[in-house]
Amino acid sequence: MKLLLLLFFLNQPPVDTTAKSGRFIAMEYKGMSNCIYEITINDSLIMGAKVNGYITIQPNFGIGTSVPRDVMHNPEAYVNKKKAAKYQDKNMGNDQFISTDGQNFIIRRKDIKSVFINTTPKWGMGYYPQSGRIMIESPETAYNKTAIRDLILVGDQNAEEVLKMFK
């Protein structure tokens, strides 16, 4: 049985662990809870779209969502496709984007005071892999209600490549 499992994993296609241009997947803690964001970066804005709610380890006893262990290294496995589909309208304005989910955020790039990688593992992540934390400091605004964002890179992502997106 162990040999079959080993052969199964050895024959899996490689997971693309490089950050896609201007986009990455991150978790942010909200008190005792958390949520998953798809972060999109363009020339002037950083937009965080909530694409999944509370992520828990297994067994979750019906509370939250668990990412199966066999795909937990793939950042896309943390995204709820139904929630992500709400953001397919490329002509969505800022107000509509924010009203799609109250936890969404928009930060103007020119407002960023600092952005850096925190390599300290986030406590409470259980067995979920994390590739570092992107820390963004910016002023609170109507579109960004948190001055310091602690975005945990879930799965296998290259923190240095993600940081380059902000440069």
Where do the model's predicted regions map?
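Acidic, Ser/Thr- and proline-rich intrinsically disordered linker/docking segments
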Residues: 15-23, 27-35, 43-167
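Sec-dependent N-terminal signal peptides
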Residues: 1-11
